[in-house]
C-alpha cells in the first residue's frame, strides 16, 4: 500500500527531495510574459536582473518598484493515488533607478530554490525468526530553500554597449527528515533521520548588451551573461534517533556535524532580441548551468550518512532555451 501527502510550502513536489530543490525562475514579469527570455531583453520600464547590463535602459526621470507572486496548481499521481495541490509563493521584490547619465542601479530580493514535500508509503516486513509479518511505514519530508539579495550596477561604456554586475548575498536552510516506523508493533523501535544544511556566501553575476540600430524603427540587441562557480559556506548536521514505539521517547540520539562541500555552478548564457518600433519584440535565449562540474561532498566515516548525502546531491548539466 502506498500513500502520498503534500506539504503546504512554496512548492509541492517530491522531486525537491534532491539537491537544492526546485530551482526558481528568477525572471520578472516582462520576461516571464515572453517565455523567459532575458539576456537580450532591454526595456527602460522593466527590471531585468538576469542581465545587469540592461539597467542602463532606464531614463533619469524613472524609478521602478516591482514585486511578484505566483500561484501554482499541481496534479500529482502515483501508485493509483491522485492528488491536487495548490500553493502561492513570493517571487521577487526589486527597485531600479538612475545614478548617473551612464550608470543605473537595481536592488532586489529573489528566491534561488524551494524545497517542500511530504511523501509516505507502507510496506510489509517478515521477521526471519518468528515468520510473523508486520506493516511498517516510511515517511519523507522536507522544507526550506535558498534566497538571494542582490545589488547591481549597469554602466553604458559606449553609445550602444552596456556592461553590468550583480553582487549578491546568498543564504538559506534546507531541512530533510526520513522516518521508518512500525505503527502496529508496540515493542518496536522507530528510526528518525534528519539532515539540516545551512548555507551562506557572496556571489557575482556579470552581463553585457550591445544594440544595433538598423534604422529608426528596427533594432537588435545581443546579450551575454556569466556567473562563476561558487563554493558555499555551510553548516551541515545529521541527527539520528531510535524512538520507542510504546513510550514515544528516544532511547538513543546521535548528532554528527561533518565537514561538507556545497557549490553552485558556472552559468553561461547568450541571447538576442529584435525590436520593431517599440511595438514588437521577439527574442531567443540559451543558457547552460554546469552542475556536473560542481562538487558536493561530506567528510565522514559513517557510510549511511555518506550514501544519503551522495544520493541527495547528484546533478546533471541544465540546458535551457527560451
Each predicted region: which residue ranges?
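Transmembrane beta-strand segments of Gram-negative outer membrane beta-barrel proteins
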Residues: 13-38, 56-75
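Short hydrophobic "helix-edge" motifs at membrane interfaces and signal-peptide entry regions
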Residues: 40-42, 148-149
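Outer-membrane beta-barrel translocator/receptor signature
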Residues: 41-122
